[in-house]
Amino acid sequence: MNLPNGHVLQNGKYRITHVIGQGGFGITYKGVWYTEVKGSLGTVQTEVPICIKEYFFKDYCYREAESFAVKVHSETGRVLFDKFKEKLIKEAKILSEVHHPHIVNVLEVFEENGTAYIAMEYIPGCSLKYMMDREGILPEPKVLRYVRQIGEALQFVHEKNILHLDIKPSNILIDSSGKARLIDFGVSKRYDIEQQETSTTMLTLSKGFASIEQYDNEGTQSFSPCPDIYSLGATMYNLLTGKIPTESILRATRPLQ
């Protein structure tokens, strides 16, 4: 059950307009942010289109019909629900401090209705996956431009000891100006100055795009840019050929032909 259109959050600061996507761990809404803009004419109230992601671990929770509060089915489920909610909040707060022209901007992280929400900028456009579904394989110059832009975004987060760990066409948006933007850091990891993991994450794999290190959770306990670089290469292969790459675990275990 989704939040209804017109539902308000943060005491009226945000208003839900409609659902734009959902998965096993969350629901994404388009919304409106009511804010003030100061200028030569004084302070003006304005509405800014935004995207709001709601943490909703659907296998373990449900929504009350009248209050819209998110409830967990069992105490066992509560442990997992809370664990990943805290991880989501922690990673979103990190991203709220990361500003790059090829990464979606996080505006705010907050808790309400028994769950967590991330308010972020709304990017008019479509994902590379949607573009491929509509147009087929993409021209090489266009692919190289997008890959270069996402590579710049990855270099930026890697310098801050952050791994994305889910690079794939559906997590790259192309905005109305034709610029690539990296989204969905839901399974990302952050590392300390000694390059040791400081945040745990669920083991989530996008087959064909995940590096072999990601098949063993210990493979990403120490910082290395290799998983993201592999996934970016797999994404480029997919965009140029229209084919999903062979899973890295199979490439590593199969004898060479």
What do the PLM-derived regions correspond to, one by one?
Residues 198-214:
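Conserved activation segment of eukaryotic-like protein kinases, specifically the C-terminal portion
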Residues 113-127, 131:
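Conserved short submotifs of the Hanks-type protein kinase catalytic core
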Residues 17-23, 28:
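Protein kinase glycine-rich loop
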Residues 62-97:
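AlphaC helix of the eukaryotic protein kinase fold
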Residues 109:
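Activation-segment/catalytic-loop signature of the eukaryotic protein kinase fold
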Residues 158-174:
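Catalytic-loop of the protein kinase fold
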Residues 146-147:
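Activation segment signature within eukaryotic-like protein kinase domains
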